[in-house]
């Protein structure tokens, strides 16, 4: 079984000079899910990992360089996630490759990424538009004392069962760390829910308690979804984290209660 420590993370590597789908490094989702009591066969959520690729280049049949940006969507039901550095190296391996057409490139990306993830991956050229302020109400201005920065403390989460609301709460203060290199991962996280009113100060303390936590982006979002669901008992819940770019890629994991459909229109934040 592949582990993060087996990947190219934290190692010096040569940039590829020719196309090589073998550079893609899959990591099973099951290990991290088992740590928080999740079973791949009975997931309590639906969702996807949406990647934005900013550094995509190849050669046309006559050898002229081409460039594009792309949106890649990996279903959360895939048995494996795609490790980010390997994704970057794979895209770079296309730089000197002649490809017949843009559609041929898209089909190649779909084939290779789907094989890595173990499930059908969607690829479309283009990116969502930028939005200056996220949709929802920021909780970052709350006047609170905070002294816990890890590990994540679900005990901070609470909800008032006497008030049932539907709202979207947003924080730009989510930070976690790569479990291999220790590099910081920065994100704005949004929680849209219907149910008992979540205590905002407790939620902010909870999100800040990820600050020294080491876990991949996708795993952090699944942990947040699971712990908010367990502690606050919403009727339904959506959690999305929009991470800042690294190596020409950013990732946006989205998890939601079964029956919730992904928003038809999404956006990128200024930090992305």
Curated annotation (Swiss-Prot):
| A single GO molecular function term of this UniProt record | preQ1 synthase activity
- What reaction gets catalysed by this protein? 7-aminomethyl-7-carbaguanine + 2 NADP(+) = 7-cyano-7-deazaguanine + 2 NADPH + 3 H(+)
What does UniProt give as GO cellular component?
cytoplasm
Tell me the Pfam families matching this sequence: QueF, QueF_N
Does this UniProt record's set of keywords contain Oxidoreductase? yes
- Tell me where in or outside the cell this protein is found: Cytoplasm
Q: Which keywords belong to this entry?
A: Cytoplasm, NADP, Oxidoreductase, Queuosine biosynthesis
UniProt GO BP = queuosine biosynthetic process; tRNA modification
- What is its pathway? tRNA modification; tRNA-queuosine biosynthesis
Provide the residue positions that the database annotates as binding NADPH: 84-85, 246-247
EC number, as in UniProt: 1.7.1.13
**Binding, substrate:** 82-84, 217-218
> Is-annotated flag, keyword Cytoplasm?
yes
The active site of this protein is located at 178, 185
**Family assignment?**
Belongs to the GTP cyclohydrolase I family. QueF type 2 subfamily.
Annotated NCBIfam families:
QueF (TIGR03138)
Q: What does this protein do?
A: Catalyzes the NADPH-dependent reduction of 7-cyano-7-deazaguanine (preQ0) to 7-aminomethyl-7-deazaguanine (preQ1).
Subunit comment for this entry? Answer: Homodimer.
The molecule here is called NADPH-dependent 7-cyano-7-deazaguanine reductase
Q: Which organism is it from?
A: Stenotrophomonas maltophilia (strain R551-3)
Instruction: Tell me the lineage of the source organism.
Output: Bacteria, Pseudomonadati, Pseudomonadota, Gammaproteobacteria, Lysobacterales
Give the gene symbol.
queF
